[in-house]
Amino acid sequence: MTTTPLGKMIQDGDFVFQKAKKGTTIPKARKKTLTKDLQVQVAKELEQESSSTFRFAYVFPRKAQNHYYSPSRTHTSSIKKKRPKLCSNINLTPWSLIDSTSNKSIREQSREMGIISIQKWAEQARMRSLCFPKN
């Protein structure tokens, strides 16, 4: 049993989805069952995790395998309810930057912040859809 930086326990049998770093080709999300070596590797990666990269490690407890996040749902309050619990406080831009109470569209908010272009925004949504395949 390994503990992540934020204190979440990782154990054998949990599933891990890993994405490649920005700039590499996007492989389909690989579903791995955690082993002792992988537990340590995931815990180390989570310590180095940065919201500026495209690399996320999602750990799903066995019971929550069928709980997935659907980027095609554009209503932000629904997305927050559907988002699986992450084992690290990973900043999922741009969803976390969007003010659902604002009158401006998501596109306008994204452009104003200048943090992420619409093209990258779509790419992230596509990558996330690979991260969370429907069972």
Swiss-Prot record:
Per the record, the domain of life is Eukaryota
GO-annotated cellular components: mitotic spindle; nucleus
* The protein's name in its UniProt record: Uncharacterized protein C31F10.17c
Lineage of the species this protein comes from: Eukaryota, Fungi, Dikarya, Ascomycota, Taphrinomycotina
